[in-house]
């Protein structure tokens, strides 16, 4: 296995361990992003830097999912619960803060802010929500959409009503993504969190420069 790949996976493993031990201070994901993007790029070159950024993006997205599940306000609920955490917020395309993914205007690009890390957010007509973590093609840090490679996490909003994944489920999902890597023409990794025999949430990460619709990525719903 190439040196930069090993370094990138080491950053992912470190992030997963830190997350599972609840080393989740206000600036934890910012530190992870700095370590993943600059550290891996320094020691592992281009590929290592990109994989390190992916690690930070996965960590931030998973933390956001946990906050969403545990504090409510997801899906199509008529009375969404306001979040108590100052480290998590959802902002519509016009800059207005909203209480739920369900309040995002379909097709418009809003954002989710988790511990000062911004993720782009799009709600589709089928009520699926995509979260994107943008970083430059050289892995040096966040970038504008036009010059960024994007990681997308995809899942159905209504899944929040089917059960709450455990922390172990989320940790296993991140580990599964790290283990399997990014495959296929667009570099796709998929994982499903399950509650008993029911599929609760499928997350799909796709490296696709300039893409803002991950729906065509080859992930199975099984």
Curated annotation (Swiss-Prot):
Entries under Gene3D superfamilies matching the protein: Smk Toxin, alpha chain, Smk Toxin, beta chain
Organism domain of life: Eukaryota
Keywords from the named record: Cleavage on pair of basic residues, Disulfide bond, Glycoprotein, Signal, Toxin
CDD domains: Killer_toxin_alpha (cd12838), Killer_toxin_beta (cd12839)
GO CC annotations on file: extracellular region; protein-containing complex
Single GO molecular function: toxin activity
Glycosites: 127
Transmembrane region(s): none
Statement: the UniProt record of this protein carries the keyword Ribonucleoprotein: no
Biological process (GO), any one: killing of cells of another organism
Signal sequence coordinates: 1-18
Cysteine disulfide links: 37-53, 190-219
Function summary: This toxin kills sensitive strains of yeast.
Note: The full activity of this toxin depends on NaCl or KCL. Its maximum activity is found at 2M salt solution.
Subunit structure: Heterodimer of an alpha and a beta chain. The fate of the gamma chain is unknown.
Name of the protein: Salt-mediated killer protoxin 1
């Amino acid at each position: 296995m190439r040196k930069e790949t090993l370094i990138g996976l080491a950053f992912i493993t470190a992030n997963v361990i830190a997350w599972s031990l609840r080393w989740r201070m206000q600036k934890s994901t910012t530190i992870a992003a700095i370590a993943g993007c600059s550290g891996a790029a320094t020691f592992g070159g281009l590929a290592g830097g990109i994989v390190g950024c992916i690690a930070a993006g996965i960590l931030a997205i998973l933390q956001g999912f946990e906050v969403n599940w545990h504090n409510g306000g997801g899906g199509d609920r008529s009375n969404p619960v306001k979040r108590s955490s100052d480290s998590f917020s959802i902002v519509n395309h016009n800059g207005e803060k909203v209480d739920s993914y369900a309040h995002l205007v379909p097709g418009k690009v809003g954002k989710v802010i988790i511990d000062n890390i911004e993720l782009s957010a799009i709600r589709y007509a089928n009520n699926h929500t995509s979260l994107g973590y943008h970083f430059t093609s050289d892995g040096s840090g966040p970038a504008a959409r036009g010059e960024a490679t994007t990681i997308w996490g995809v899942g159905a909003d209504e899944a929040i009503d089917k059960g709450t994944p455990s922390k172990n489920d989320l940790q296993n999902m991140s580990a599964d993504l790290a283990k399997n890597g990014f495959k296929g023409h667009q570099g796709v990794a998929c994982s499903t969190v399950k509650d008993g025999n029911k599929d609760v949430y499928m997350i799909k990460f796709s490296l696709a420069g300039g893409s803002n619709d991950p729906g065509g990525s080859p992930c199975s719903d099984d």
